[in-house]
Amino acid sequence: MAEVGGVFASLDWDLHGFSSSLGNVPLADSPGFLNERLGQIEGKLQRGSPTDFAHLKGILRRRQLYCRTGFHLEIFPNGTVHGTRHDHSRFGILEFISLAVGLISIRGVDSGLYLGMNERGELYGSKKLTRECVFREQFEENWYNTYASTLYKHSDSERQYYVALNKDGSPREGYRTKRHQKFTHFLPRPVDPSKLPSMSRDLFRYR
């Protein structure tokens, strides 16, 4: 995992000074090279067993993602992304994977799918860890976080595409979002294993 910082620094050219802090670690901006590296990371995660996760300590965080609109984000096995008001829902337990400074991917523990955003700003669950599944995690002044696509933004401005949930829990398209809207504000909430559905406890412990 030592080369991850160098690889993902090239995903976001706005991380001023980040590459210099990496010393002589080679940076690559070829989409093919990046996708290959993402595949390698995905493979390590999929092959992981309970004893294999020691090297990922501090890199993996299991959380619920609560939106200011009152919903927890869920990733379903069919690739659908939606919000629920149910605390500790089966598909609302998420794995936050730190890739580099401020860059993360989010995976559903039960569904095994990664949160992705396509060029239209639509959220979906991806079987593969691709560049569409990499987000910039930003801590805002109101103690909430925002999650912006590192791949897509408005072509006529610097405005980012953000992960967002509407007031009815449906996903809001990234092109319709702004950083200071409540739709885009999230709190990563701790997971209490005792509150998980019984069918999900083993997944939470071992996946």
Swiss-Prot record:
Molecular function in Gene Ontology: fibroblast growth factor receptor binding; growth factor activity
InterPro entries found in the cross-reference section: Fibroblast_GF_fam, IL1/FGF
Location within or outside the cell: Secreted
Listed Gene3D superfamilies: 2.80.10.50
Phosphoserine PTM positions: 111
GO biological process, one term: positive regulation of endothelial cell chemotaxis to fibroblast growth factor
SUPFAM superfamilies: Cytokine
Transmembrane annotation, as ranges: none
UniProt GO cellular component terms: extracellular region
Main location: secreted
PROSITE patterns on file: HBGF_FGF
The entry's keywords: Glycoprotein, Growth factor, Phosphoprotein, Secreted
Glycosylation sites: 78
Protein family per UniProt: Belongs to the heparin-binding growth factors family.
Protein purpose: Plays an important role in the regulation of embryonic development, cell proliferation and cell differentiation, and is required for normal cardiomyocyte proliferation and heart development.
Record's subunit section: Interacts with FGFR1 and FGFR2.
Protein name per UniProt: Fibroblast growth factor 16
